[in-house]
Amino acid sequence: ILLCSNNESWGAYFFDEKEVVARAQTSWQEHPFTEYLEFEFNDFTENSVYCALNWGEKSIPFEIEVDISETVVNQLRNDLRGTARFSYVGPLEAADWCVSNNTNLEEALEWAKLAVTMDKQFQTLKTKAAAEYALGMNKEADLTMKEAMPLAGIFELHSYGRQLITEGKVTQAMDVFTANLELHPNKWPVNYGMARGLSAKGDYAKAAEYLKKAEVNCPDDNNREIIKKNIEKLGRNEDIN
């Protein structure tokens, strides 16, 4: 298979080697009759796909593989030269993607700093801290999160605490849930968060106390039913996370 930069010519009557941009070895395969030339894509993975050129009673399959990190990062850079740069959302999403995929971390930190400059809020500071943690800048990241905490809403802190539990950072999660309790006392999600943190630490009795408080303040039947089931789990010394 030869892929050429010239897509105007018909067939190979006036083939020019200098226009070849990629080549691959493949073999014909039998295929149900296809009257019109078609390209079929199958077997998708994160960084590859199989393409088949089908025509007549033949199929010519070949694999296309790309460096997904390099491809996406280049696109992010290009996007941030346009309208995406006019809002904090553009650099924030670019930084988030890089941190989530553990790639291009230095530039991700610069994008996160730009997002903070444009709109200092919990999410932008949290992403900046995530980039700093990924780069091993733990002291700086701790200070960034300390700055972010007072700017967060109830559910933002609750979600962040749950994220930390998932990452195995139970002590840090407990600090977040405690901060949420101090900032937003007597709210059912806050008490639920305290219960999750204490459950992760293995203190099921104390966790049940907070979960019972959450049950009293819970405004809807669906969540109240989930809380009841989790109280039962804690009574059996089972983690609710």
PLM region descriptions:
Residues V116-T117, M149-P150, T178-L183, V216:
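Conserved structural position within tetratricopeptide repeats
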Residues E93, T127, S159, G193, ...:
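Canonical tetratricopeptide repeat
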Residues Y88, F122-Q123, G153-L157, V170, ...:
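Helix-start (N-cap) detector for alpha-helical repeat units in TPR-like alpha-solenoids
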Residues I1-F86, E107, L114, M118-D119, ...:
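Long, contiguous interaction/recruitment modules in multidomain scaffold/adaptor proteins
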